[in-house]
Amino acid sequence: MNKPTILRLIKYLSISFLSLVIAAIVLGGGVFFYYVSKAPSLSESKLVATTSSKIYDNKNQLIADLGSERRVNAQANDIPTDLVKAIVSIEDHRFFDHRGIDTIRILGAFLRNLQSNSLQGGSTLTQQLIKLTYFSTSTSDQTISRKAQEAWLAIQLEQKATKQEILTYYINKVYMSNGNYGMQTAAQNYYGKDLNNLSLPQLALLAGMPQAPNQYDPYSHPEAAQDRRNLVLSEMKNQGYISAEQYEKAVNTPITDGLQSLKSASNYPAYMDNYLKEVINQVEEETGYNLLTTGMDVYTNVDQEAQKHLWDIYNTDEYVAYPDDELQVASTIVDVSNGKVIAQLGARHQSSNVSFGINQAVETNRDWGSTMKPITDYAPALEYGVYDSTATIVHDEPYNYPGTNTPVYNWDRGYFGNITLQYALQQSRNVPAVETLNKVGLNRAKTFLNGLGIDYPSIHYSNAISSNTTESDKKYGASSEKMAAAYAAFANGGTYYKPMYIHKVVFSDGSEKEFSNVGTRAMKETTAYMMTDMMKTVLTYGTGRNAYLAWLPQAGKTGTSNYTDEEIENHIKTSQFVAPDELFAGYTRKYSMAVWTGYSNRLTPLVGNGLTVAAKVYRSMMTYLSEGSNPEDWNIPEGLYRNGEFVFKNGARSTWNSPAPQQPPSTESSSSSSDSSTSQSSSTTPSTNNSTTTNPNNNTQQSNTTPDQQNQNPQPAQP
């Protein structure tokens, strides 16, 4: 190829490339201006408005007006320089240099996202103010069009307002936890002073809170608040705003320095605090908007009368005789037909001066013990055809966790031999539960649990009798909220509904969003009925007799966790029956309720009558909910038949001598389901047909746990 030809080719390619670049710019510009043409108009009234959100109950009665009760705006001249330096250090280093957007920061965020395969923001302080005022804060709403509008409005605002005005808007707009809106409000209520009278470490604490105000609340989470404050101070030092000496003095100042006793910031009843916290979380999850900083009307599913009655059960001795004031209770009640949470409470004797604090009702940091057996072991076994009747014979005999030499123990260290499935569940025997999970297979059990809203990062055979998980994320494990929703699927015939606290949101522009909860099939109707039929006997003959009400058709399961031998030796030091957690999950045709009881300090044991509180709280609340309602029992569905006290799938044998149908083998289990079904003379006694049954009272090694407790052996290795 000669030189003129090469030059012509280079010229052609250059022109083509330049044309593509120009076309891309024109097209991109066109798309950008299309997006920004739909952006809301800037309004000073919105930037400074004291927005509030009204919350209503399920009868459309006003519960709370959040945002109206505490907001004291700071004037620009009263904002201390150290606060400005702290805010720009942690939020926007180049705030005084950019004009609304920071191209250097955007490029840096882009490169970090490429390197870490994650999403990190490049928003300036001005963009954050725009987001708080006009847009959703949800990550899922970070669309290109939204980002374009946000950037455009930030540029517009920078042209119309000074940097001082923008900072003032921001300082007065942000939520600062405990019902406080704006940093001046927080200064007065946390320290009893105005902003311009606070110390450097106090200002650094306030500057760091807006990104996660409840997480960095110095009253509820002092360690996290101190870490965040010290990060702000470190950034101030790195930016040259404070000296090394100032930094050292500030970081060594206790986080509690100057904090006064927290006063109640709420204009709503104390019994609503836990529920409202979940309303706030669900509104943001479903809409992307924080109702504490965005004005809206929220219609919830709470039954205020039921909520108040639950509060009374917790905080008086009229319904339950509590052993002391320190014993804690957390529970959730859902409507089984739609998943609506009608009541929820996370603690007894809650502090009236903390807003939206820890809600134990949704925490997964305690073990739900044997309440996991119905949903992890037995329901999957019936669903997948491992068992075909409630009279199926299971083995309560010496057994190791599959793939290990670690034995599974019952509470009494004894064995009942061959017993029916119904009796194994009724008496909460551990060995048949673990063996059943092995037959079902870990993967199938995990899939079944997922269908009920419960997940583990990985499932182990110990999860047959425990909800323990190595992850602290609330996504994993069990809580009263999750268990009430899971058990509701038994009550309604097999449909899982996500727990819902809200049913409608009306935004400030008049638009609304309704939330209709569409359920998903979690199990066959036959599975749900067979489980219900077995769990009825838990209340009549088994471990749940403290929840029994003769006039009310209901079903449920007890649960108890326990201490390790080391914990007993070093901390508990008693031969009594003790437990860190006692639980009950149960339901009627209308409501499902799950109850956790224990002490905030796990090493404070439940003893004596304390071990009966969970079932008694459940019984008291179900009495209130069901009295005068003409409660209905469950009807046996097609595909099942009853023989005496047991329920069988069509085609399953119901006598000792008739042939059993073939059971599909588990593809994951190390042992097949070769157990046959039979009837027993009574579900209230072990089978007398088994000559190897042992008397639990003849064992030389006694457990220090209650009759419903499972052993907590070290996590077994997977085979």
From Swiss-Prot:
Enumerate the residue ranges of region (Transpeptidase).
297-611
Region (Disordered) residue ranges read 652-719
- Signal sequence interval, chain numbering: none
Supply the Pfam families for this chain: Transgly, Transpeptidase
Show the active-site residues: 91, 370
Q: Which reaction does it catalyse?
A: [GlcNAc-(1->4)-Mur2Ac(oyl-L-Ala-gamma-D-Glu-L-Lys-D-Ala-D-Ala)](n)-di-trans,octa-cis-undecaprenyl diphosphate + beta-D-GlcNAc-(1->4)-Mur2Ac(oyl-L-Ala-gamma-D-Glu-L-Lys-D-Ala-D-Ala)-di-trans,octa-cis-undecaprenyl diphosphate = [GlcNAc-(1->4)-Mur2Ac(oyl-L-Ala-gamma-D-Glu-L-Lys-D-Ala-D-Ala)](n+1)-di-trans,octa-cis-undecaprenyl diphosphate + di-trans,octa-cis-undecaprenyl diphosphate + H(+); Preferential cleavage: (Ac)2-L-Lys-D-Ala-|-D-Ala. Also transpeptidation of peptidyl-alanyl moieties that are N-acyl substituents of D-alanine
User: Per the similarity annotation, which family is this?
Assistant: In the N-terminal section; belongs to the glycosyltransferase 51 family. In the C-terminal section; belongs to the transpeptidase family.
Tell me the protein's name: Penicillin-binding protein 1A
| Gene expressing this chain | ponA
